[in-house]
Curated annotation (Swiss-Prot):
Top-level division of the source organism's lineage: Eukaryota
Modification Phosphoserine, positions: S180
Biased composition range(s): Acidic residues: 389-402
Basic and acidic residues: compositionally biased ranges: 365-377
The keyword Lipid metabolism belongs to this UniProt entry's keyword annotation: yes
Family in the record: Belongs to the IRS4 family.
Keywords for the protein's UniProt record, in alphabetical order: Lipid metabolism, Phosphoprotein
All residue ranges annotated as the EH domain in the record: 460-571
Protein name: Increased rDNA silencing protein 4
UniProt feature, compositional bias: Polar residues: 50-65, 248-260
A UniProt-annotated Pfam family: EH
SMART domains: EH
Length: 615
C-alpha cells in the first residue's frame, strides 16, 4: 500500500519537500506505531521505570485496575472534549465502521500520520548528510508491525481525548490511566535514552493522598534499558552518537499531546529536541554534580562559603575599621591558555601610591615608590589642611629627636577625634555676672546701657549737647517775635547766651524715636519753660533724656524732679550704685535702727530699776 505525496507541500507558512522514498517510509512508520499501540492495548503491561523518590513507586496490578476503571467511566466524557476538524483520510486506507462516524478520530489519524512522516523525513535527511550506515527510524519500528489497525485507531482516539483533559494537571495529579498510556508511548522510543523528564511518579490509590508538587528532575538521570542497567559514563558517551540515528526522546510526547499542532511547529520542535542530547553530553560535569538541586552553579569559583566570608569581613570593617594596607600593593594577573589548559602567572605589577598632593617628576616618583616598598616611611600631621604628609627616614630635613612622636601616624580613632575637635562648634560659656570692662554706648540700642537712675549722666549729657550745638540758631527768623522783623533791638539782649532751638526742629528730632505723637507732645509740655515755640539748652537736654527713658521702658513721670534739672548743669558722680546694693544698704540700716531701739529700751529699764530702788 503506497500513498502518493507531492514533492513540495506548503503548510503552516513553510514549504516541506518530501521524496517518494521519504513518504513511503513515513507511512510505514506510522502504520508500525499504530499496530504497536493496538498490541499494547490488548495486553497492557506498564514499562519498568525508575523513580528517584521511593515513596512514589506502585505495583503493576494497581496500574491495571485504575486504568480499566477510569477508561470505562471517563471515555464518553473525554471524547467530547476533542476538537472537531474536517479532514480526509489517506488514500487506500480503510477504517472500521466503529470509527468512521467519529470525525475526531479521523483528524487525529491524519495529523499523526503527517507528524510521523515529518519525523521519518528528518531522520532520513540526517542520515544522508552524515553518510552513516546506522539503522533509521523505519528499521527500529519494523519489528513492532502487526496487522491489526482497527484497535490502533481506537486507542489513539482515547489517548488524544485524555491528553486534552490532562494538559492542565500537574505531573503529581494525573491519573494512572493517562500515565500508563504515556509510558506505553515512551517504551519503544526511549530505548537508548539515558533519562526522560516525562517520567512522573504514580499515585497510591489505597492511601487516597495526592503527592505534593515537586520540581521536575534534571534531564540526565539513571534508567533501565532493556534487561540490564548501564553505567552512567557509558550512557553519557554513547548518547551523542545515538541521538542522531535513534528516535527523538520526546517523540512519544509529540505523538500523544501534539496531535492538533501544525506541521511547521512540529518540525521546529523536533529540531530543538534533537539538539538537547548533544548539549547535555557536553555539560556532563555540571549536571551530574547538581542532580536534584535545581539550576547548576553558573558562577565559577564561587560558593556560599566565599559569600559568607565576604559578609563577615565587611562587618568587621564596619565595627573595627579597615586594617592598614601596605602602600606598595602588588597585583597579580593570571592568563589562561585555552589550548594547553595551563595558567601562567605574570610578574607582579607595582603601582605608586602616595599621599602627597603636589605633583613631582617621574624620577622622584619612582624613588619615592621604592622607598615606600622598602618600608622607610613615616607620616607627619599637617593641622592646616588636616592631612598627613609622607616622609622618608633618609630625608635630611626630617628631625630625628624632637619630632619623633609627630612623625608616627596616629590611630584612626585619634584622627577622628582630632577632626571632630577641629570641626565641631564650640559651646559658648556663660559670661561672668560682673562686667570687667565698660561697654560703649550703642546709639541704635540705647537701652543696653541703661541703668535705673534719677539724673542725667555725663555721657548722656554729652550726646544731647552735641545734638543741641548742631541744631541751634536755625530758622529762628521764622518766628513772629524775632527782632529782625520788628526792628526791636531790646529783645535780642534778653535771649540766653547758649542760644535757642526751634520747636519744629525738636519735633523732627524726637519723631525718629517712633514714639507716638501724643507722648512726644506731653514730654514737650513738661520741658517747655519759655512758651514761645523755642527750647533752651536745659529744656532740650531734659526732653531728650525723657524720650530715652520712655524707650528704655520707664513710664513718663507726672512731674520732672529737681535733681534731673540740676544734673544738667552740674557734674554728677559717675559711680552708680546698683539696685541690689541699695537694697542691702537699706536692710542693714533697718537692722541698725532695731539694735538702737533695743539698746534704748534696755537703758530705760535700768533707769527705772535704779529709780525704784533708791526710792
Amino acid at each position: 500500500m503506497r500513498l502518493s505525496f507531492g514533492k513540495q507541500r506548503y503548510h503552516g507558512g513553510t514549504t516541506v519537500t518530501l521524496t517518494e522514498q521519504g513518504a513511503s517510509d513515513s507511512l510505514r512508520a506510522a502504520q508500525a506505531i499504530f499496530q504497536n499501540h493496538s498490541n499494547e492495548v490488548s495486553s497492557p503491561c506498564p514499562p519498568v521505570t525508575v523513580s528517584r523518590n521511593p515513596q512514589t513507586r506502585l505495583s503493576e496490578p494497581s496500574l491495571q485496575k485504575s486504568g480499566r476503571k477510569q477508561e470505562q467511566k471517563k471515555a464518553r466524557i473525554r471524547t467530547k472534549q476533542v476538537p472537531k476538524i474536517k479532514t480526509t483520510a489517506p488514500n487506500d486506507v480503510e477504517l472500521s465502521k466503529k470509527h468512521r462516524s467519529s470525525p475526531a478520530g479521523k483528524d487525529n489519524v491524519s495529523s499523526t500520520a503527517q507528524m510521523a512522516a515529518a519525523l521519518a523525513h528528518s531522520q532520513s535527511k540526517l542520515s544522508s548528510d552524515n553518510n552513516s550506515s546506522h539503522s533509521s527510524a523505519l528499521d527500529t519500528l519494523k519489528v513492532l508491525e502487526t496487522p491489526n489497525l482497527n484497535g490502533l485507531l481506537g486507542i489513539h482516539s482515547r489517548s488524544s481525548s485524555r491528553n486534552g483533559s490532562n494538559e492542565s494537571l500537574t505531573p503529581g495529579q494525573r491519573t494512572p490511566d493517562n500515565r500508563s498510556q504515556e509510558n506505553l508511548l515512551t517504551s519503544f522510543s526511549s530505548g537508548r535514552r539515558l533519562s526522560s523528564s516525562s517520567m512522573e511518579p504514580a499515585t497510591n490509590k489505597d492511601s487516597n493522598k495526592a503527592l505534593p508538587k515537586r520540581r521536575p528532575s534534571p534531564p540526565l538521570q539513571s534508567s533501565l534499558v532493556g534487561s540490564g542497567q548501564l553505567h552512567e559514563n557509558e550512557n553519557l558517551s554513547s548518547i551523542s552518537i545515538d541521538s542522531r540515528h535513534s528516535l527523538n526522546p520526546d517523540t512519544s510526547d509529540v505523538i500523544s499531546n501534539r496531535s492538533q499542532t501544525s506541521l511547521s511547529q512540529t518540525i521546529n520542535q523536533l529540531s530543538l529536541c534533537e539538539s538537547e542530547p548533544s548539549i547535555a553530553s557536553s555539560n556532563t560535569t555540571t549536571t551530574t554534580s547538581n542532580q536534584g538541586s535545581g539550576l547548576p552553579n553558573l558562577v565559577p569559583n564561587y560558593s556560599s562559603d566565599m559569600r559568607k566570608k565576604k559578609l563577615v569581613n565587611k562587618f568587621k570593617r564596619k565595627v573595627f575599621g579597615s586594617k592598614p594596607k601596605h602602600l606598595s600593593s602588588q597585583y597579580e594577573m593570571d592568563a589562561s591558555s585555552e589550548e594547553l589548559g595551563q595558567h601562567e602567572q605574570q610578574p607582579s605589577m607595582r603601582f605608586k601610591t602616595t599621599l602627597r598632593k603636589t605633583s613631582v617628576s617621574t624620577n622622584a616618583e619612582n624613588d619615592h615608590a621604592s622607598s615606600l616598598h622598602e618600608g622607610n616611611l613615616r607620616y607627619k600631621y599637617n593641622p592646616s589642611n588636616d592631612t598627613y604628609d609622607v616622609y622618608d627616614d633618609t630625608d635630611s630635613d626630617s628631625e630625628s629627636d624632637q619630632n619623633q612622636d609627630a612623625l608616627t601616624k596616629p590611630r584612626k580613632r585619634d584622627r577622628i577625634k582630632r577632626k571632630i575637635r577641629n570641626s565641631a562648634n564650640k559651646t559658648a560659656h556663660h559670661r561672668p555676672i560682673h562686667r570687667t570692662r565698660d561697654r560703649k554706648f550703642n546709639e541704635d540700642k540705647p537701652w543696653k546701657s541703661h541703668t535705673d537712675i534719677t539724673f542725667v549722666t555725663d555721657n548722656e549729657r554729652k550726646r544731647y549737647e552735641s545734638m543741641w550745638v548742631s541744631n541751634r540758631h536755625r530758622h529762628l527768623n521764622l518766628l513772629s517775635w524775632w527782632p529782625s522783623l520788628t526792628g526791636d533791638s531790646g529783645a535780642i539782649n534778653t535771649l540766653p547766651e547758649d542760644g535757642l532751638i526751634l520747636g519744629i526742629i525738636v519735633r523732627d528730632i524726637w519723631k525718629r524715636s517712633n514714639l507716638p505723637n501724643s507722648l512726644l507732645a506731653e514730654i514737650y509740655t513738661k520741658v517747655d519753660t519759655r512758651k514761645d515755640g523755642t527750647l533752651d539748652r536745659k529744656s532740650f537736654i531734659v526732653g531728650m533724656w525723657l524720650v530715652d527713658q520712655c524707650l528704655y521702658g520707664r513710664k513718663l513721670p507726672n512731674v520732672v524732679e529737681q535733681c534731673v534739672w540740676d544734673s544738667v548743669d552740674r557734674y554728677a558722680s559717675t559711680m552708680v550704685v546698683p539696685v541690689s546694693t541699695l537694697k542691702a544698704m537699706a536692710k542693714q540700716k533697718r537692722k541698725q535702727m532695731k539694735e538702737e531701739i533695743k539698746n534704748i529700751k534696755k537703758e530705760n529699764r535700768v533707769v527705772l530699776v535704779d529709780h525704784n530702788s533708791s526710792s
